[in-house]
Curated annotation (Swiss-Prot):
NCBIfam families, per the entry: lpxC
EC numbers for this chain: 3.5.1.108
HAMAP family (alphabetical): LpxC
Keyword Lipid biosynthesis belongs to the record: yes
Disulfide bridge positions per record: none
Keyword Zinc: yes
UniProt pathway annotation: Glycolipid biosynthesis; lipid IV(A) biosynthesis; lipid IV(A) from (3R)-3-hydroxytetradecanoyl-[acyl-carrier-protein] and UDP-N-acetyl-alpha-D-glucosamine: step 2/6
The protein's name in its UniProt record: UDP-3-O-acyl-N-acetylglucosamine deacetylase
GO cellular component: membrane
GO terms for biological process, alphabetical: lipid A biosynthetic process
InterPro entries: Ribosomal_Su5_D2-typ_SF (IPR020568), UDP-acyl_GlcNac_deAcase (IPR004463), UDP-acyl_GlcNac_deAcase_C (IPR011334), UDP-acyl_N-AcGlcN_deAcase_N (IPR015870)
Assigned keywords, A-Z: Hydrolase, Lipid A biosynthesis, Lipid biosynthesis, Lipid metabolism, Metal-binding, Zinc
Cofactor requirements of the protein: Zn(2+)
Length: 309
């Protein structure tokens, strides 16, 4: 898709917050070109608008949290990943709680609702952040790098000392169709002892086997098991798509990550923005000339077969 897009019409989404356990409602409203994604939250007395960009990230310990003027919205990464993959550039999001609903722990419900609502193409051309030089970030065992690519690609490796996870590897060229089929259904995951600790400390109050893969000493506790043998690494890719969307533009680059999470993802986004000599903003017409439209949403599915050099 050459041009920016927003939703066809308002979309209301309700669900439980993972950490608060509260019922939360969001109203996603169409926005003008170049608006970006903006969350509007309230504490009952005032309304604060928080653009979903890296500069507004205030916490990455358990999820990606954006905030401004003392108010914040947590766990935005699954929704942001779905918006990016479905080609939504501009949106107002009214939210009546401190976190995005967890839904089933994946991005699949968001993708289904967005595709049912549909996109409205706008008159402004879309811009891409095209990586021109490699950038690498290392934090202990965690590593993230990004190198030039004509598409948005993610290669991810994780390593856990548990037989249910162990070593997992997945590489993907991210577009609407691959995201919908291979990444969006992957749920957040955690170990039983971690969940118990969080709940004892007033967190993960909305967490359950209905919205997370929970792993005990003997294996996965969910009655239906996992959706993919490598569901955990797929979910890490989902998180990365959401976290890298906070660059404010779709990426043309190949992300390679090892043991990465929200913290180092955010650090990498900040490092990219700080090294302006390593990237260039290009308009969609120029990106299309390089065969780069496979990232751009529902109308771009037909481009997914374009060969990459």
């Amino acid at each position: 898709m050459i041009y920016q897009s927003t939703l066809n019409k308002p979309l209301t989404i309700s669900g439980i917050g993972l950490h608060t356990g509260r019922q939360i409602t969001m109203i996603l409203r169409p926005a003008e070109p170049d608006n970006g994604i903006i969350f509007h939250c309230t504490d009952g007395e005032r309304r604060v608008s928080i653009p979903a960009v890296s500069a507004n990230v205030v916490d990455t310990r358990l999820a990606t949290v954006i905030g401004k003027d003392g108010l914040s919205v947590s766990t935005i990464e699954h929704l942001m990943a779905a918006l990016s993959a479905c080609g939504i550039d501009n949106l107002h999001i009214d939210i009546d709680g401190p976190e995005v609903p967890v839904m089933d722990g994946s991005a699949a419900p968001f993708v289904a609702l967005l595709q049912e609502t549909g996109n409205r193409v706008q008159e402004k051309r879309r811009k891409y952040l095209a990586i021109r030089k490699p950038i690498t970030l290392v934090d202990g065992e965690k590593r993230v790098s990004i190198i030039p690519s004509r598409f948005f690609r993610i290669t991810f490796d994780i390593a856990f000392d548990h037989p249910c996870i162990g070593l997992q590897h997945r590489a993907i060229k991210v577009n609407t169709e691959t995201f919908r089929k291979e990444i969006a259904p992957a749920r957040t995951f955690g170990f039983l002892h971690e969940v118990e600790y969080l709940k004892a400390n007033g967190l993960a109050l909305g967490g359950s086997l209905d919205n997370a893969v929970v792993i005990g000493e003997e294996g996965v506790l969910n009655p239906d098991g996992v959706r993919f043998e490598d569901e955990c690494v797929r979910h890490k890719i989902l998180d990365a798509v959401g976290d890298f969307s906070l660059l404010g533009h779709r990426v043309l680059g190949h992300v390679k990550a090892y043991k990465a999470g929200h913290d180092i993802n955010h650090q990498m986004v900040e490092k990219i923005l700080a090294n302006a000599d390593c990237w260039q903003l290009v308009e969609s017409g120029e990106a299309a000339s390089h065969g780069s439209l496979s990232m751009t949403g529902c109308a771009a599915m037909a481009m997914a077969g374009v060969a990459e050099a």
